[in-house]
Curated annotation (Swiss-Prot):
Family stated for the protein in its record: Belongs to the class-II aminoacyl-tRNA synthetase family.
Lineage of the organism: Bacteria, Pseudomonadati, Pseudomonadota, Gammaproteobacteria, Moraxellales
Annotated localization: Cytoplasm
Organism name: Psychrobacter arcticus (strain DSM 17307 / VKM B-2377 / 273-4)
Cofactor: Zn(2+)
Listed name of the protein: Alanine--tRNA ligase
CDD domains per record: AlaRS_core
GO cellular component: cytosol
InterPro entries: aa-tRNA-synth_II/BPL/LPL (IPR045864), Ala-tRNA-lgiase_IIc (IPR002318), Ala-tRNA-ligase_IIc_anticod-bd (IPR018162), Ala-tRNA-synth_IIc_core (IPR018165), Ala-tRNA-synth_IIc_N (IPR018164), Ala-tRNA_ligase (IPR050058), Ala_tRNA_ligase_euk/bac (IPR023033), DHHA1_dom (IPR003156)
């Protein structure tokens, strides 16, 4: 391989090498794992091949090569806290991998590694700098490395079970508690004696001298929940080499952040922030985080308060805080997207395609956090006053930063870490308990059935042609996650058939319902899902007993099938109408299709107006009224895309796909195009008229840049329209007008109410002014400072602020606390003259008072406000306030 060794060149060289070894290049899968509920994010190259390794998803190739996008932030695999503090931790990284599915095994796998690393045609790394590790009992791997490759035995290190359990070893790889696993061999590069660190397996192994660059897993087993190791259908190979690490070696540097890719991003960050790039930790954080954030957004993740969206929010806010640390006083992080696209957009075109979406999403989140960042940092600074290296910040303070200022706890920990201070996490967790359901919970993902379901042949779906089938075979039964020979009356379980008319949940459509009958029992199917190549029927035995290997009759509930098909077809028409009205930037983000309702989530950065909703609804119903036949064809995916069929980004498709065409044709760019053409494996109507009618029932925002439309069809739409008509008639009757006059009458009433509210506000201000006239008589002097504390009846927060402005002009160098008492609520406000804020702060007064009253509040040193519910002890708390203020002033 010729110089220079750019990261992009190394990525391409890896792919080219394995193509020359008859490997099929496979595109990186989405960072959102497909059909794998055990993973928060894709974190290894083998994730997309998991079911292939299990023998449940055959492919038309047995060798593959990939450059896989990976994220390790949140969940079990989490490197977020270390980014910026080490030379090699990242939230996002690229994993170069080659895979064998029952093809070659250890001999060829090891040989390919050595050839690519050391051959003059490829990387030409000095062989004397390479060490390898193997699993302690893997004599076969030892012989290949020593006898065939020629590595001296002293550079081959055996690693046993060093993690406290059988098969718990650095050289026995597992994907999780269950799933594919096996012994592995790892290649290490020696950076030289001038770098601290020891060989793998020694106490000094965590140093930077010997760095792992390639891990080759010999996939032989499928670990069960009870720890049993079952042989995989065919021994396979799964390898991974971090692009960032191998780039550091090829570019002659010791740390990943010194390679071309990161240097360019750090230079861009320094230019945006108008500082010099001196390899500051904060620049490393920004360069790393823009990669994770941009790729996550491109793959459909949006900031939120739970799950993947909360991890994204944490990463963005951590980057923003580090920019603030470097002097950023305005939004900056979104400006890093363009340099990233320039650096990685060729290898990953989705970055270029989604650039504006990524920038807008980041900028909105950045602007939202900016509103509270400065306040939160001030609060944290005050909490850290007096704490020293080794001390502990209270969990209560960390929770307040999270709850009030939007600081994820790991962001607070990141800041305190710089001063050697830790957080009382146990106390923080206690405060979080009340909000646990809304907060991030990386452990919320379900048990993975792919590690449980074991069938010899994939289930054949026959439901496109029929609703029922006699003479199907029960291939397997499961109860409580374990294989069963039979299920008896009242038992819940899972049934796997050799053939089934039941549609399994997919493409947004829910799984079907119905019955499976045998000669000895009846199984009520309550849901249908996929697990690898098996279709699994969830339900309960309602009569008798069913057994494995029995012959059965399977029947889908026809009314549910028909209603679901109408809603699914309507969803396609809705998608096309949205793109026509709102523009081609609209992309599907999710959907739910049941027999009762359809729900469609899509990317759009503002609410859809009522006029747009009406136009979208009208377009869909025009297509329904046209009553054109739907057309379903199977074709190669390349041909489908060429015809204009829309594919969902991140969805996994085979070489042959099912294409659904609906609606009347129109001419687009000189080419005849149908109203809707999409890839879809779901169930649909035969003609658009079968849908009947569509009625949009709601439109709302569910996350930054994501909108949701809900709608109903057929009789459910008729019912919705009739209910609306009835409500309108009742409203007209109450208002004593005709139905067409309801809107005008409501507008007139609203105008009148606004006028009355303004009159009431003016009256309240007069009452407040009348009460305030004598307030100066209540002033007392404490420690030489004029102090006024007064409660005003019938006065709200807005009037309190107006009064405060008036009184503080008449009472300089003072402390003023006003409490408005109206409608069982207390409005709190405090003003402290700037000349006095070195002795007492308004924010402290309000925090104390609100806390004692059971409310919330805070603010600046000179002005703060809050609120609290009125209670029986409110008067006593307020009466005690002068003494508290006096104590602070003394």
């Amino acid at each position: 391989m010729s110089q220079p060794f750019r990261s992009a060149d190394i990525r391409q060289a890896f792919i080219d090498f394995f193509i020359s070894k008859q490997h099929t290049p496979v595109a990186s899968s989405s960072l959102i794992p497909h059909n794998d509920p055990t993973l928060l994010f894709t974190n290894a190259g083998m994730n997309q091949f998991k079911e292939t390794f299990l023998g449940m998803e055959p492919r038309d190739y047995t060798r593959a090569v990939t450059s896989q996008k990976c994220v390790r932030a949140g969940g079990k695999h989490n490197d977020l806290d270390n980014v910026g503090y080490t030379a090699r931790h990242h939230t996002f990284f690229e994993m170069l991998g080659n895979f064998s599915f029952g093809d070659y095994f250890k001999q060829a796998g090891i040989g390919y590694i050595w050839e690519f690393l050391t051959s003059d045609e490829w990387l030409a790394i000095d062989k004397n700098r390479l060490y390898v590790t193997i699993y302690e009992t893997d004599d076969e791997a030892f012989d290949i490395w020593h006898k065939d490759i020629g590595i001296p035995s002293e550079r081959i290190i055996r690693i046993g079970d060093n993690k406290g359990a059988p098969y718990a070893s650095d050289n026995f790889w597992t994907m999780g508690d269950t799933g594919p696993c096996g012994p592995c061999t790892e290649v290490f590069y020696d950076h030289g004696a001038d770098i601290e660190g020891g060989l793998p397996g020694t106490p000094e192994e965590d140093g930077d001298r010997y760095i792992e660059i390639w891990n080759c897993v010999f996939m032989q087993f499928n670990r069960q929940k009870d720890g049993t190791m079952l042989p995989l259908p065919a021994p396979s190979v799964d390898t991974g080499m971090g692009l960032e690490r191998i780039s550091a070696i090829m570019q002659g540097v010791h740390g990943n952040y010194e390679i071309d890719l990161f240097v360019h991003l750090m230079d861009a960050a320094a230019e945006i922030l108008e500082i010099e790039n001196q390899q500051q930790s904060s620049l490393k954080v920004i360069a790393d985080h823009i990669r994770a954030v941009s790729f996550l957004i491109a793959d459909g993740v949006t900031p939120s308060n739970e799950g993947r969206g909360y991890v994204l929010r944490r990463v963005i806010r951590r980057a923003v805080r580090h920019g603030n640390k470097l002097g950023a006083d305005s939004d900056f992080f979104y400006k890093m997207v363009a340099p990233l696209v320039a650096e990685m957009g060729i290898a990953y075109p989705e970055l270029k395609d989604k650039q504006s979406v990524i920038e807008n999403t980041i900028q909105k989140e950045e602007a939202q956090f900016a509103k509270t960042l400065a306040q939160g940092l001030r609060l944290l600074a005050s909490e850290l006053e007096g704490l020293q290296d080794g001390d502990t910040l209270s969990g209560e303070a960390a929770f307040k930063l999270y709850d009030t200022y939007g600081f994820p706890v790991d962001l607070t920990a990141d800041i305190t870490r710089e001063r050697g201070i830790v957080i009382d996490e146990a106390e923080f967790d206690e405060h979080m308990q009340a909000q646990r359901e809304r907060a991030r919970d990386a452990g919320k993902f379900d048990v993975d059935y792919s590690s449980v379901i074991q069938v010899e042949n994939p289930t054949t779906f026959i439901g496109y042609e029929q609703l029922e089938q006699e003479g199907v075979a029960i291939d397997a039964l499961y109860q409580d996650g374990n294989p069963a020979d039979s299920l008896t009356e009242g038992m819940e379980g899972v049934v796997v058939l050799d053939r089934t008319p039941f549609y399994a949940e997919g493409g947004g459509q829910v799984g079907e319902l119905g019955e499976i009958r045998t000669a000895t029992g009846v199984f009520d199917v309550q849901d249908t899902k996929k697990s690898g190549q098996a279709i699994i029927h969830y339900g309960v035995v309602t009569m008798g007993e069913i057994k494995t290997k029995q012959t059965a009759d399977a029947q889908v509930l026809s009314s549910i099938r028909a209603a679901s098909a109408k809603n699914h077809s309507a969803t396609h028409l809705l998608h096309a109408a949205l793109r026509e009205v709102l523009g081609d930037a609209v992309t599907q983000k999710g959907s739910l299709v049941s027999s009762e309702v359809l729900r469609f989530d899509f990317s759009y950065d503002k609410p859809v107006s009522p006029a747009e909703i009406m136009r979208i609804e009208r377009l869909v119903n025009e297509q329904i009224q046209a009553n054109t036949p739907t057309r379903i064809e199977n074709m190669p995916i390349d041909e489908a895309i060429k015809q204009g069929a829309m594919a969902l980004f991140g969805e996994k498709y085979g070489n042959d796909v099912r294409v659904l065409t609906m609606g009347t044709d129109s001419i687009v760019d000189g080419q005849r195009m149908p109203f809707s053409i999409e890839l879809c494996g779901g169930l649909h109507v035969q003609r658009t008229g079968d849908i009947g009618v569509l009625k949009i029932t709601s439109e709302s925002g569910i996350a930054a840049g994501i909108r949701r439309i809900e709608a109903v069809t057929a009789m459910n739409a008729i019912k919705n329209i009739q209910q609306s008509e009835q409500q309108l008639s009742e409203l007209a009757s109450q208002l004593k007008v005709k139905r067409p006059e309801v809107a005008q009458r409501v507008r007139t009433m609203a105008d009148k109410q606004r006028d009355l509210e303004k009159q009431l506000e003016r009256l309240e201000q007069k009452i407040a002014s009348a009460q305030a006239a004598n307030l100066l008589d209540e002033v007392q002097t404490i420690a030489g400072i004029p102090l006024l504390i007064s409660t005003l009846s019938g006065v709200d927060g807005k009037s309190i602020r107006t009064l405060m402005d008036d009184i503080k002009s008449k009472l300089p160098d003072s402390v003023i606390v006003l409490i408005g008492d109206k409608d069982e609520q207390l409005a709190l406000a405090a003003n402290v003259a700037k000349s006095v804020t070195d002795r007492i702060k308004a924010g402290d007064i309000i925090r104390y008072l609100a806390g004692e009253l059971g409310g919330k509040g805070g603010g600046k040193p000179d002005y703060a406000q809050g609120g609290a519910p009125k209670s029986n002890n409110s008067a006593a708390v307020i009466a005690a306030l002068p003494a508290w203020v006096a104590a602070q002033l003394s």
